[in-house]
Amino acid sequence: MDASTKTKKGAGGRKGGGPRKKSVTRSVRAGLQFPVGRVGRFLKKGRYAQRVGTGAPVYLAAVLEYLAAEVLELAGNAARDNKKNRISPRHLLLAVRNDEELGKLLAGVTIAYGGVLPNINPVLLPKRKENAAASTPKSPSKAKKSPKKA
């Protein structure tokens, strides 16, 4: 047995010990920011099913990334509306509750330090006097004066 035919230690099952290729993560392959490997590990560790397909963690990571981007965009808009540069839990709550679909998805979720949506029942608001204001003149000088007696 020649020493040249044996594989070198630490070659990872590859023939020879040439330059190693740079590893490409599944997140990069899928074009995602969220970690596909970590999501896959959580799926396996959580025992949601006996087996987990190769596409499942990629799909779930993509869905999570989309939801996070959607919430962050709306929360950023809420922060900008309030003239703030930093997103707070209040901005997250306003973003989620003002969006119909996200509000339905996160209906049972409590956001800590989020507060409540501003809401005043219309019955409690002061009544507008548009009809009365339109029928009476605005200033007494412009009202019809009674004719002067001679």
UniProtKB/Swiss-Prot annotation:
Pfam families: Histone, Histone_H2A_C. The nucleosome is a histone octamer containing two molecules each of H2A, H2B, H3 and H4 assembled in one H3-H4 heterotetramer and two H2A-H2B heterodimers. The octamer wraps approximately 147 bp of DNA. It is found in: Nucleus; Chromosome. Residues 1-26, 128-150 are annotated as: Disordered. Contains 2 SPKK motifs which may interact with the minor groove of A/T-rich DNA sites. Phosphorylation of this motif may regulate DNA binding. This motif is reiterated in both termini of histone H1 and in the N-terminus of sea urchin histones H2B, but its presence in the C-terminus seems to be unique to plant H2A. Keywords: Acetylation, Chromosome, DNA-binding, Nucleosome core, Nucleus. High expression in root meristematic tissues, moderate in whole shoot and very low in mature leaves. This is Histone H2A.1. Core component of nucleosome. Nucleosomes wrap and compact DNA into chromatin, limiting DNA accessibility to the cellular machineries which require DNA as a template. Histones thereby play a central role in transcription regulation, DNA repair, DNA replication and chromosomal stability. DNA accessibility is regulated via a complex set of post-translational modifications of histones, also called histone code, and nucleosome remodeling.
